[in-house]
């Protein structure tokens, strides 16, 4: 992965984003779909198409529609019915009612089905008799649902790599130190739990939290004012206007003062749709005071090799050196060394010198850069900054005039630094949009833009590209059969 991190290589699929496009998009079970197009040499090639916003693999969501398709009323009705059948079996209000009834049961009657991931009332016991069932569910366990629920681990859609206690505590301490009193937790259930546990203990200062997450299972444990079923890739509230108003009311309390957005999206997700949704959440926060020039602050957890993409969406963001670690990820854990360290960092528009990283973990303050850096991040006097991205000491290359990874060497044939065993030559270099050799696609002056002048994100996705290729004749009958069964 070291040779590919931060690469501009792509397969020519881009996503077009604007409110008008999303409002007009057909819906799949995950809400409005996104509009994609294949681009080559700066021009659109072929037809635009709609695909699921949350699932990049069509095995997870098979929705596909050409933009110019004429969809019959019968097919629209079948699609609507299909989407409804793939929604949670109960409304949030019904889940809340079940939760109240569950908490009133004696300890011996509180059961949880591990197979179905569901709290069981006595009337449900018989239908789950052959399943793996946990008994004696305590009230303290109900306050930590992320430890009861199995994490969803599809990294391209709804991956749940849950914060380790170390990182969760650091975030909590930072929130308190910076004076925030309301936290919008977008895809961060562990942090939401910690904030609520702290509130139950009567800790001061009091902090409130609202969880937005695509995992509807949390509806079983939280009131409607504490959780909203939400897709962060298309800004879709599954609970409709009522859920949207819950979020807006939360953000606008005390005229929006003391609010913070903390998010931890799936690492396989597209950056620009995420940024588009976060900007819309900012707009919800700003509604009460449109004249306010400030923005809702954001802490965004994402791998460091997406830095350039995030900065293109949020130029005022800074990447912190803090390494975020997770309980249920084999590699993203604290204490590992070299390239085994977690690549997940915090991107934020908050002043980096105000976010104090723990000295006990080796972080120190660089007075020149005016931010905290990890022990391996040495200040380069030539670059005039602490240049390391991955925690290892980087070295300065005078020919490239920048710092590079310690394992890289300068290649005179390619005229840049790379891994020693890299393939030499000019293949793959330059811009695939216009063919220019002096820049990459992301810096192309002929870049295609959306209706609002925003840069369109390139979709690094082989699955969609593969799905557009012609299939062998032997598979044609199966495809037609699937098309009849799946609206």
UniProtKB/Swiss-Prot annotation:
Q: Provide the top EC class.
A: transferase
Quickly give the catalysed reaction.
adenosine(4220) in 28S rRNA + S-adenosyl-L-methionine = N(6)-methyladenosine(4220) in 28S rRNA + S-adenosyl-L-homocysteine + H(+)
Q: Which domain of life is it from?
A: Eukaryota
Instruction: Please give the GO cellular component terms listed in this UniProt entry.
Output: cytoplasm; nucleolus
Region spans: Regulatory loop: 323-343
Give the binding site residues for Zn(2+) 3.
366, 369, 379, 386
Keyword list (alphabetical) reads: Cytoplasm, Metal-binding, Methyltransferase, Nucleus, S-adenosyl-L-methionine, Transferase, Zinc, Zinc-finger
GO terms of molecular function = nucleic acid binding; rRNA (adenine-N6-)-methyltransferase activity; S-adenosyl-L-methionine binding; zinc ion binding
Q: Which intervals hold the zinc fingers (CCHC-type)? A: 429-446
Q: What is its EC number?
A: 2.1.1.-
Q: Which locations, inside or outside the cell, does it occupy?
A: Cytoplasm; Nucleus, Nucleolus
Q: Which residues bind Zn(2+) 1?
A: 28, 30, 52, 61
Q: Where does Zn(2+) 4 bind?
A: 380, 383, 396, 403
> What's this protein's function?
rRNA N6-methyltransferase that specifically methylates the adenine in position 4220 of 28S rRNA. N6-methylation of adenine(4220) in 28S rRNA is required for translation.
- This protein is called rRNA N(6)-adenosine-methyltransferase ZCCHC4
């Amino acid at each position: 992965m070291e040779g590919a991190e931060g690469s501009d290589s792509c397969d020519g699929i881009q996503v077009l984003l604007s409110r008008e496009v999303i409002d007009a998009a057909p819906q799949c079970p995950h809400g409005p779909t996104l509009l994609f197009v294949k681009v080559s040499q700066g021009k659109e090639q072929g037809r635009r198409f709609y695909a699921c916003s949350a699932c990049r693999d069509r095995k997870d969501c098979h929705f596909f529609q050409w933009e110019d398709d004429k969809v019959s009323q019968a097919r629209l009705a079948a699609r609507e019915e299909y989407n409804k059948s793939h929604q949670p079996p109960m409304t949030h209000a019904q889940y809340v009612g079940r939760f109240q009834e569950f908490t009133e049961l004696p300890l011996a009657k509180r059961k949880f089905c591990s197979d179905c991931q569901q709290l069981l009332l006595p009337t449900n016991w018989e239908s789950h008799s052959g399943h793996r069932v946990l008994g004696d569910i305590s009230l303290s366990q109900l306050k930590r649902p992320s430890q009861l629920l199995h994490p969803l681990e599809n990294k391209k859609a709804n991956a749940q790599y849950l914060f380790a206690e170390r990182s969760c505590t650091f975030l909590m301490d930072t929130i308190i130190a910076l004076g925030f009193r309301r936290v919008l937790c977008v895809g961060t259930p562990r942090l939401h739990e910690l904030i609520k546990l702290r509130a139950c203990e009567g800790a001061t200062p009091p902090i409130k939290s609202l969880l937005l997450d695509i995992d509807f299972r949390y509806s079983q444990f939280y009131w409607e004012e504490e959780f909203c079923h939400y897709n962060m890739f298309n800004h879709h509230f599954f609970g409709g206007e009522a859920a949207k108003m819950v979020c807006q009311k939360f953000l606008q309390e005390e005229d929006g003062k003391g609010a913070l957005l903390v998010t931890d999206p799936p690492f396989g997700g597209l950056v620009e749709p995420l940024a588009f949704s976060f900007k819309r959440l900012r707009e919800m926060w700003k509604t009460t005071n449109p004249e306010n020039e400030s923005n809702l602050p954001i802490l965004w957890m994402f791998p460091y090799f997406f830095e350039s993409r995030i900065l293109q969406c949020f130029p005022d963001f800074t990447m912190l050196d803090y390494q975020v670690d997770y309980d249920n990820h084999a590699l993203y854990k604290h204490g590992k060394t070299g390239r085994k360290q977690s690549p997940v960092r915090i991107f934020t528009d908050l002043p980096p010198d105000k976010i104090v990283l723990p000295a006990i973990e080796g972080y120190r303050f660089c007075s020149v850069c005016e931010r905290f850096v990890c022990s391996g991040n040495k200040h380069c006097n030539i670059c005039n900054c602490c240049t390391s991205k991955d925690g290892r000491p980087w070295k300065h290359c005078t020919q490239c005039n920048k710092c590079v990874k310690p394992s890289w060497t300068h290649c005179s044939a390619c005229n840049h630094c790379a891994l020693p065993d890299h393939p030499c030559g000019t293949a793959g270099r330059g811009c695939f949009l216009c063919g220019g050799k002096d820049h990459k696609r992301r810096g192309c002056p002929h870049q295609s833009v959306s209706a609002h002048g925003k840069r369109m994100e390139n979709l690094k996705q082989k699955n969609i590209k593969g799905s557009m290729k012609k299939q062998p004749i032997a598979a044609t009958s199966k495809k037609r059969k699937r098309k009849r069964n799946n609206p």
